[in-house]
């Protein structure tokens, strides 16, 4: 082909842009290069065609990439438990904050897998995510329960969350999950109040009362109550009251006034012992299948992180309102008698925790590493709190105590 020659005749080149509402069909020869006005007209036609093409193609691409992402989750809680309500609250917050781009559906315990099978189901992708507590994974790796039912070293649940976010806890949890091949992305949230010692046939007056007692608990508290002499059975929440009703348990603990009332504890016991060190600083866990989580857009991951912290605050406020109301109704309507756990029992719990921690740390290097991290944070944080936060008992007695005649 000679220099300067082209394969086609310029005058025969056609511009065809396939747009649903326009088809431009013009020859370059229709716009003589010597006519300035016609040249401008030609450029305007070309420009308009390009803009129109972009206006159509961009929405088509967006449509191909958009559409809500649906996730099927399960909680470890019965549908009637306030804990499942918290799970639904969390899902709604994420769904709303993503503008519906992520739609999480949360099923109650047992819908797909048993409560204690949540970790495996999420890790394998049978479920996209779940709502539960780390203590329910105790059988997979006992150090996981240090976020749920360990000694906490004087910290409350909010301090555990502070340690988790700012004291290295999140990194240690990721390390733990990696050690057992857990394909999960975990978020902790929702500080729980100190849990009762439990529900019994008669008040607990000394540690020896646990000797031979058939008792329900979970996580590291299994080791604690076993050391106290109890015959421990780790049952999920929905199975506790039926077991007590059939005489398979002499006593049990679950969590709080609202959950315990909704699950039917007052129907099988009228004695509840308040305060204990077996679960004084528990939190909830939000779990995503990591493969699915990693595939989410960065913006959506940021929303999930923010929604988790927002849900954590809201849950703690709802708990104060609901638990206090149910605490009153347990006494007035259900005729439950509440007793404070004797200090001697609490002291024995602390002594046994020291022994359990020492033994577990010797057996499990990761357990030892987590305990060291928690203790270092607690020594500083708890001292600050104890030195600065006033004991409110004086104010409560002043404003609401019995008035002199």
Sequence positions of predicted segments:
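N-terminal secretory/targeting leader peptides
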Residues: 29, 34-160, 178-405
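A gly/proline- and charged-residue-enriched helix-loop-helix capping module
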Residues: 158-172
């Amino acid at each position: 082909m000679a220099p300067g020659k082209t394969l086609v005749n310029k005058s025969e080149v056609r511009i065809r842009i396939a747009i649903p509402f326009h088809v431009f069909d013009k020859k370059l020869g229709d716009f003589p290069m010597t006519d300035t006005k016609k040249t401008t007209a030609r450029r305007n036609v070309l420009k308009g065609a390009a803009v129109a093409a972009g206006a159509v193609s961009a929405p088509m691409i967006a449509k191909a990439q958009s559409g809500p992402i649906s996730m099927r989750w399960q909680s470890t809680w019965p549908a009637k438990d306030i804990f499942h309500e918290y799970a639904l609250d969390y899902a709604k917050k994420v769904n709303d904050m993503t503008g519906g781009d992520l739609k999480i559906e949360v099923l109650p315990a047992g819908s797909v897998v048993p409560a204690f099978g949540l970790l495996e189901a999420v890790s394998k992708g049978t479920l996209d995510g779940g709502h539960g507590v780390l203590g329910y994974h105790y059988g997979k790796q006992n150090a996981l329960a240090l976020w749920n039912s360990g000694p906490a070293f004087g910290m409350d649940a909010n301090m555990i969350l502070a340690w988790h976010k700012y004291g290295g806890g999140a990194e240690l949890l990721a390390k733990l999950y990696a050690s057992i091949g857990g394909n999960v992305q975990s978020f902790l949230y929702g500080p729980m109040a100190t849990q009762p010692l439990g529900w019994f046939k008669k008040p607990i007056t000394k540690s020896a009362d646990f000797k031979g007692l058939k008792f329900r608990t979970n996580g590291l508290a299994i080791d604690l109550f076993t050391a106290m002499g109890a015959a421990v059975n780790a049952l999920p929440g929905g199975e506790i009251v039926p077991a007590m009703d059939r005489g398979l348990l002499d006593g049990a603990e679950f969590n709080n006034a609202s959950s315990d009332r909704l699950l039917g504890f007052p129907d099988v016991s009228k004695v509840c012992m308040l305060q204990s060190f077996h679960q004084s600083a528990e939190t909830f866990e939000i779990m995503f299948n990591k493969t699915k989580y990693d595939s989410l857009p960065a913006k959506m991951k940021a929303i999930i992180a923010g929604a988790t912290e927002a849900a954590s605050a809201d849950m703690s406020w709802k708990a104060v309102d609901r638990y206090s109301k149910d605490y009153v109704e347990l006494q007035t309507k259900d005729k439950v008698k509440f007793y404070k756990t004797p200090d001697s029992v609490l002291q024995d719990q602390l002594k046994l925790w020291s022994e359990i921690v020492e033994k577990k740390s010797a057996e499990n290097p990761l357990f030892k590493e987590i305990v060291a991290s928690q203790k270092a944070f607690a020594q500083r944080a708890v001292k600050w709190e104890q030195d600065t936060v006033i004991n409110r008992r004086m104010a409560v007695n002043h404003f609401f105590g019995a008035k002199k005649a």
